[in-house]
Amino acid sequence: MAAQGSLLIASFLLILLVLAKPLGSGLARLIAASPLPGVAGVERVLWRTLGITGHEMNWRQYLLALLTLNLLGLSILFCLLFWQEWLPLNPQRLPGLSWDLALNTAVSFVTNTNWQAYSGESTLSYFSQMAGLTVQNFLSAATGIAVVFALIRAFTRQNMHTLGNAWQDLVRITLWILFPVALIIALFFIQQGVLQNLSAYQPITTLEGAQQLLPMGPVASQEAIKMLGTNGGGFFNANSSHPFENPTALTNMVQMLAIFLIPAALCFAFGEAAGDRRQGRALLWAMSFIFVVCVAVVMWAEVQGNPHLLTAGADSSVNMEGKETRFGVLASSLFAVVTTAASCGAVDAMHDSFTALGGMVPMWLMQIGEVVFGGVGSGLYGMLLFVLLAVFIAGLMIGRTPEYLGKKIDVREMKMTALAILVTPMLVLLGSALAMMTDAGRSAMLNPGPHGFSEVLYAVSSAANNNGSAFAGLSANSPFWNCLLAFCMFVGRFGVIIPVMAIAGSLVSKKAQPASQGTLATHGALFIGLLIGTVLLVGALTFIPALALGPVAEHFSLP
């Protein structure tokens, strides 16, 4: 089975790199604000129609544009969900959502988290899914990519005060990257058997003679951007383990590739935009190393079997609990790491049913900030924060002012870097503590002991880091949990974006210094090792005590 796992990981990464490199070249053109071939005329018409000027923005104007778009989207989506029963395309006559669930869901999809405290097929109408959630899947993904575009320009421009035009970036990202790639993926999903219709739910008679209602809906179109935009919110409650969302092993592989496609392509784009492809490859190597190790650990943990099943007299040669037989243990383990390394959160197996160590790795990948490939845009700007921290640490060790790509990293940049890195750990630890201290928080726990605490820790980690996956043994649809997680999602998203944009505004005004003999090379194996060590060290120091109370304690309590 080790050979099968190694082959699966290698083939996945090989296909990913083959697809990501050409897409990275297209993204690099957009970073340079150069229209893609053949679309310049279309863009001119769009700018006139939408009233978008070509004036570039400083970091505050760029940030204000992004915040305005997202707050407007949040308000509209909340209204769509709250008054759902009065809107069209609701063949099942589903009622509107409660105010707290509508708020939680709206914040969730606007922040690219896609945490779901509801069952999609029994809660949301087709109109809410299409006009509400799918639209935000595009806009939230475009927002993350636009932020990293601004940060990359800050490194590549000199003595300037502008970072591009946010409205032009958002339109270009959506029309020329997200929409065409999502369309191709959606058509492939339809060919494989994923649903795409507006029919009412279909009553059927099962082989046993029982009556059953099969859910329908425009699934493929939402499924494509759900994966490509690292959104993760499923059309159905079972997410990508549902055969109507993910029917075959082939769609399962394509879904995993779609999750990592843009994050990997952005690494190539960063190297091209910086004028040194080695810089992008160094980040890709660091991400890939952590990813492969994490996949290997989860696969090893899951093929060991579940001792609880063994004591119950069940077959425990491998841990198949919570997994689909059409995917198996290895593919399910790979999917779990892919979806939590990226801030996607889609699942093709129930993470709550993984072994203690198998479930700890996805949780830890979220807790370190979703920087191992990460979300579209957010993964790269998160990793670049760790790059700045790594060069700062290296500067302290050798007694030189830290610099990256020729830009000196001063006190202002380090303050903003520290703030951005500390936002999500504070949310996770304080949010988990609040939940465990209150009756409203503890009453949602369906399991006692270390596993119950793990479910709470996983939920808050998922929300604060904008992942959206869950250990399912938590009744999270209550005013307390909806409000707590909505707060964590909102602050975890924009509490990082704001200091990142401040860093970009500071760096873009600086002049790049030529490299000297004392300059730290940021593209070699030494720096890759330093970067990996920085990520691991920050993650270990921050979360080992909490993990020791949850999955580690659960592992050592196994029979």
Curated annotation (Swiss-Prot):
GO CC entries: plasma membrane
InterPro entries documented for this protein: KdpA
Function: Part of the high-affinity ATP-driven potassium transport (or Kdp) system, which catalyzes the hydrolysis of ATP coupled with the electrogenic transport of potassium into the cytoplasm. This subunit binds the periplasmic potassium ions and delivers the ions to the membrane domain of KdpB through an intramembrane tunnel.
Assembly and interaction partners: The system is composed of three essential subunits: KdpA, KdpB and KdpC.
One matching Pfam family: KdpA
Single GO MF annotation: potassium ion binding
Entry similarity comment: Belongs to the KdpA family.
Name of the protein in question: Potassium-transporting ATPase potassium-binding subunit
Main location: membrane
Membrane topology: Multi-pass membrane protein
The entry's keywords: Cell inner membrane, Cell membrane, Ion transport, Membrane, Potassium, Potassium transport, Transmembrane, Transmembrane helix, Transport
Taxonomic superkingdom: Bacteria
Protein localization: Cell inner membrane
NCBIfam families: kdpA
Regions that span the bilayer: 7-27, 63-83, 132-152, 170-190, 253-273, 283-303, 327-347, 356-376, 379-399, 416-436, 484-504, 524-544
